[in-house]
A protein has these predicted regions:
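Auxiliary Fe-S-binding modules of radical SAM enzymes
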Residues: 1-44, 239-376
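Conserved Radical SAM active-site core
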Residues: 55-190, 196, 360-367
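Iron-sulfur (Fe-S) cluster-binding segments and ferredoxin-like electron-carrier domains
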Residues: 39-63, 107-117, 324-328, 348-355
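Generic structural "secondary-structure junction" signal
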Residues: 33, 42, 51-52, 62-67, ...
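N-terminal juxtadomain amphipathic helix
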Residues: 6-89
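Conserved AdoMet/S-adenosylmethionine-binding subsite of the radical SAM
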Residues: 122-283
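A generic "binding-loop/recognition-motif" signal
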Residues: 46, 98, 199
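Short, cysteine/histidine-rich loop/knuckle motifs that typically chelate Zn2+
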Residues: 35, 49-52, 97-100, 104, ...
Length: 376
C-alpha cells in the first residue's frame, strides 16, 4: 500500500495536531474557523464548540488527528445504508467532538467528550485501512461523531482505504460550509445524512444549528457528486413526528433530490438531555413510512425496531421483494451483480458489486494493531 504524504507538523504541537486550511483572520485579531456555519472566532489557545479544532498561532488546527474511538466491524446496514454493498462488513469508528449540540444525542459520550487522551486509541490512516482489509471489510465508516470536525483525518483515511481497494462512508449531520464540504466528500463513496427534522425551529431549539445548511448539503451530494446518499430522520415523540412535518420532508426529498433517494425513519431512545421524552412507538415509524411512500418516495425504511416489512427493499416496477432483512440479516437477495431486479430487470438504485455479503448482525469490536501516527 502506498504511503500517504505526511501533513505539515505544527510547531510546538504534539503529533496529533495538524494544520487546516479552513480559517480566516479577522480585524480584531481573532481567527475564524470556516469549516461549518458556526464560525467559531477564537483567540490564542481557545477551542471551537466542537472542541477538537483550536487556535494555535495564526491558524486553526485539528487536535485529534489519528485519535480514534469505537473501532468495530458492523453490517453496512447499521449506518444505515441499505443500497450500498448490502450485507457487507464495514470498519466503523469515530474520534471525539461534534459541531452540533443536539439535546437528544444518542452518542453523547463520544461526541461531547472532552477526554480525548483517555477516550481514543491511536491509528494512522494506512494502518487503519490495512486492518480493515485484513479483516475482510469492504469499507470504512466515519461515524459515532461527525467527520465534519475531523475532515483532514477522515480524508486521509478515505484515501488510504481507496488505495487498499476499500470504500469510504461518511455518517454526518451535513452541517458544513461549501468549501469544506467539497473537500470532505471528494474523498467519500457513500454518505448517510441525518436530517434531524424539517423545521428551522427544531434545529435552533434542539440541535442549535440550521436546517437550510443541511438541505444544501443534500442537494450538493445528490446533484453534484457521485457519492451514494441515503437519509436518516430520528423521530422524537412530540418534537418532529407530526404527519404534517413528515409529509413536508418527504415531499421536499421527492421534489429536490428525487424519489429514489432512500429515507430511513429510526426510533429514538431517551438519552443525554432528553431523558424525559419517551421512546418512539413502532407504530409511529410505520405511519411515517406510509406517509413518505404516499408522497412518492420509493425506498423508505424503518430502523431501531423489528419491522421486516419496513426493512425490505421492493422492486418499484414489479413488486418483487428484492432484499428481505430481519434486523441486519439478509434472508433473501434478488438483485443481480449489476444492480437489477432478477425478476423484471429494472434498475435498483445504489451501489451493488456482486452478490450480497453474509456478515449478518454481528458487531465485532477490534483493536488496531501496531498503532502509530503518520501524518499527511
Amino acid at each position: 500500500m502506498a504511503a500517504l504524504t505526511p501533513r505539515p507538523r505544527v510547531e510546538g504541537a504534539d503529533a496529533f495536531t495538524v494544520g487546516t486550511g479552513f480559517h480566516r483572520a479577522l480585524d480584531d485579531g481573532r481567527i475564524e474557523c470556516t469549516v461549518c456555519p458556526r464560525a467559531c472566532r477564537l483567540r490564542e489557545g481557545q477551542r471551537g464548540l466542537c472542541f477538537v479544532r483550536a487556535r494555535m498561532g495564526d491558524q486553526i488546527v485539528l487536535t485529534s488527528y489519528g485519535r480514534s474511538s469505537g473501532f468495530c466491524i458492523d453490517p453496512v446496514e447499521k449506518k444505515p445504508l441499505n443500497h450500498f454493498l448490502p450485507g457487507t462488513p464495514v470498519l466503523s469508528f469515530g474520534t471525539a467532538g461534534c459541531n452540533l449540540a443536539c439535546r437528544f444525542c444518542q452518542n453523547w459520550d463520544i461526541s461531547k467528550s472532552r477526554e480525548i487522551d483517555t477516550l481514543s486509541s491511536q491509528a494512522d490512516a494506512v494502518t487503519l485501512a490495512a486492518t480493515a482489509k485484513r479483516l475482510g471489510c469492504n469499507s470504512i465508516a466515519f461515524t459515532y461523531n461527525d467527520p465534519t470536525v475531523f475532515l483532514e483525518y477522515a480524508a486521509d483515511c478515505a484515501d488510504a482505504a481507496r488505495d487498499a481497494g476499500l470504500k469510504a462512508i461518511a455518517v454526518s449531520a451535513g452541517y458544513i460550509n461549501a468549501p469544506a464540504r467539497r473537500e470532505l466528500y471528494s474523498h467519500m463513496d457513500a454518505a448517510n445524512i441525518d436530517l434531524k427534522a424539517f423545521t428551522e425551529d427544531f434545529y435552533k431549539r434542539i440541535a442549535f444549528a440550521s436546517l437550510r445548511t443541511v438541505l444544501d448539503t443534500l442537494e450538493y451530494l445528490v446533484h453534484e457528486t457521485d457519492v451514494w446518499t441515503e437519509i436518516t430522520t430520528l423521530l422524537i415523540p412530540g418534537h418532529n413526528d407530526s404527519d404534517a412535518e413528515i409529509a413536508a420532508e418527504s415531499a421536499w426529498i421527492a421534489e429536490h433530490l428525487g424519489p429514489e433517494v432512500p429515507l430511513h425513519f429510526t426510533a429514538f431512545h431517551p438519552d443525554f438531555k432528553m431523558r424525559d421524552v419517551p421512546p418512539t412507538p413502532p407504530a409511529t415509524l410505520r405511519r411515517a413510512r406510509r406517509i413518505a411512500l404516499d408522497a412518492g418516495l420509493r425506498y423508505v425504511y424503518t430502523g431501531n425496531v423489528h419491522d421486516p416489512e419496513g426493512q425490505t427493499t421492493v422492486c418499484t416496477d414489479c413488486g418483487e421483494a428484492l432484499i428481505v432483512r430481519d434486523w441486519y440479516r439478509i434472508d433473501r437477495y434478488a438483485v443481480s451483480d449489476s444492480g437489477q431486479c432478477v425478476r423484471c430487470g429494472a434498475r435498483v438504485p445504489g451501489i451493488f458489486e456482486g452478490p450480497a455479503g453474509d456478515w449478518g448482525p454481528k458487531r465485532q469490536p477490534i483493536r488496531i494493531a501496531a498503532p502509530s501516527v503518520s501524518q499527511r
